[in-house]
Structures are given as C-alpha cells and as structure tokens.
C-alpha cells in the first residue's frame, strides 16, 4: 500500500509497504538527484560551440556541418539566431551550397530543433544514471522521477537557447512529413508511450520526443511497483510535463525570478511534491 499525504506545513509523508518515508528521507532521495547534477557534463551528443567562420566539414557531410553550426547559433541566441546564410558563413561555404541541402531557413531550424530535443533527452538520461540507485525499489522509482524533473529544469536554465529552440514552432519539411505518415501507418494498433488507453491525439504524438518517452518510462515504473494505479496512468505525462515546463518558462521568460539555484531547486521540489502527491496513493 502506498499512502501520500501532507503533514504539517506542505511536507510530504509516504508509506510504502508499511515503511514510512519521512520528509527527511524524501528530501534525501531528491537531494541525491540534485547532487548528481553538480559538476555534471553535457550529454554525449552535445554539440561543441564553434567560433564564427571557423567551422569546417568533411567532404560529403555539409548537411551535418550546417546543422552543427545551426546548433551553435541556437545555443547562443535561440531559434531566431538560426539563419541559413550565417550557418553557411560559419562553415565556410556559399549560401548556394547550403541551399542544396536545406530549402530554406525553416528546414535548417527544424533540423536544429531535433538536435536540441536530443540534447535535452541526453541530459535527462545522464541525470537518471548519475546518482547512486536506491536499494528500495519504491525509493528508486521516486528518485528517477525527480531526477527527470530536475534535469529538465536545469537544462532549461543552463541552455536557454537550445531549450527555446527545442520547443519552437517550425514547419516540418515535406520529406520528414512523408516519413512521419509512413511511421504512423506502421504503428497502428501498437502500444504507445502515453498509455495505450490515451484518447488525446496530441498526447499520443508526444511519444516522438525522447524526453517524453523518458518521463513515460518513469511513470510506467510507478505502475509496475504498484505506486500508481493503472487506471490513472493514461495521459499522466501531460500534467507532470506541463508543471515542470511551465516552471522553466516562468524562470526563463516570465516574472518568476528566484535569484539562485537553491531557490530554483526549492521551487522545483515543491512542484515535484505536488506531482507525486497527485499521482500516487
């Protein structure tokens, strides 16, 4: 049995199989994930920033070189900084050569957006693996969920340009759209990451985000351990993601200025407590 309730002043107390998870123990689990982030490194697919005009490419690899240059531009200035002509200048080729690989600005931005999404997912996976696993499966499941949330927020704060680019609006290139339709047709009737009972098409489509899949896997683990009832599993990613993404947006572009990482972590812990308390029982 898994009971969650607030004790005292907004503190979470959890009972797993008769063992009380005290506020101190819960905080210890969350802090383990926070400490794993300290001194962390960029994800394995992180693109090195290039000096303007110094990026080069191997023969036959111009499309990737332009995408890497676009990632460097996005890292510094967000999606508005991703300009095909500037990427060509950094790589050292003519705009005409760049247009042989990308039809225009939107196509390059779409490719950079996918790379930014991958870097976010890499950061989340690295955060989950960095901390020492908890011996108790229930504590480990909660540690993984909180690690995912902390990694998401810290990526947003440390890589604001890439974070904004990862979720910017851009038209999908025609060839990518054709591939997507083919994939959708081949997946009809397949179990989906947002829960096989998901009735929200937009939520089902989010499974293409690796970051979304990582969150889904964390929630699936809660179900496997009996911490989250199966009937509450469908679409559970949506409120969890919305809360953490909303906090990241408020910290980056909104009126919420907490000043330092300790205050940011405290605010995120409050959000994660709310998510856990709303999901498990």
Where are these regions (language model features)?
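C-terminal peripheral helix-coil segments that are non-catalytic and often amphipathic
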Residues: 1-50, 209-213, 217-225, 249, ...
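Basic, helix-initiating cap at the start of DNA-binding domains
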Residues: 2-5, 11-77, 84-86, 90, ...
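An amphipathic alpha-helix adjacent to DNA-recognition modules
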Residues: 60-71, 75, 80-81, 92, ...
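Key DNA-contact positions within bacterial/archaeal DNA-binding proteins
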Residues: 94-96
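Hydrophobic alpha-helical connector segments
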Residues: 125-162, 186-194, 203, 208-209, ...
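Amphipathic alpha-helical packing segments from all-alpha helical-bundle domains
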Residues: 139, 175-227, 234-239, 262, ...
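Amphipathic alpha-helical segments used for helix-helix packing
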Residues: 157-198, 249-257
């Amino acid at each position: 049995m898994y009971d969650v309730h607030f004790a005292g002043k907004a503190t979470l107390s959890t009972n797993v199989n008769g063992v009380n998870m005290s506020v101190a123990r819960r905080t210890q689990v969350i802090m383990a994930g926070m400490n794993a982030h300290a001194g962390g490194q960029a994800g394995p697919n992180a693109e090195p920033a290039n000096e303007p005009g110094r990026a080069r490419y191997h023969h036959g690899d111009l499309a990737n070189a332009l995408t890497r240059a676009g990632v460097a531009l996005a890292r510094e200035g967000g999606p508005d900084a991703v300009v095909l002509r500037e990427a060509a200048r950094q790589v050292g080729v003519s705009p005409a050569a760049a247009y042989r690989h990308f039809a225009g600005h939107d196509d390059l931005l779409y490719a950079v957006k996918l790379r930014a999404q991958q870097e976010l997912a890499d950061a989340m996976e690295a955060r989950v693996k960095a901390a020492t696993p908890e011996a108790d499966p229930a504590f480990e499941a909660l540690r993984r969920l909180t690690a995912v949330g902390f990694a998401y927020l810290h990526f947003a704060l440390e890589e604001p340009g890439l974070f904004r680019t990862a979720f910017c609006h851009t038209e999908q290139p025609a060839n990518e759209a054709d591939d997507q339709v083919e994939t959708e047709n081949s997946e009809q009737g397949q179990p989906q990451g947002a829960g096989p009972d998901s009735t929200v098409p937009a939520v089902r489509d989010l499974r293409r985000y690796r970051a979304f899949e990582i969150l889904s896997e964390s929630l699936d683990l809660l179900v496997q351990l009996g911490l989250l009832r199966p009937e509450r599993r469908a679409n559970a990613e949506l409120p969890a993601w919305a809360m953490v993404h909303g906090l990241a947006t408020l910290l980056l572009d909104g009126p919420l200025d907490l000043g330092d990482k300790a205050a940011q972590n405290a605010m995120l812990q409050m959000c994660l407590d709310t998510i856990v308390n709303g999901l498990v029982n």
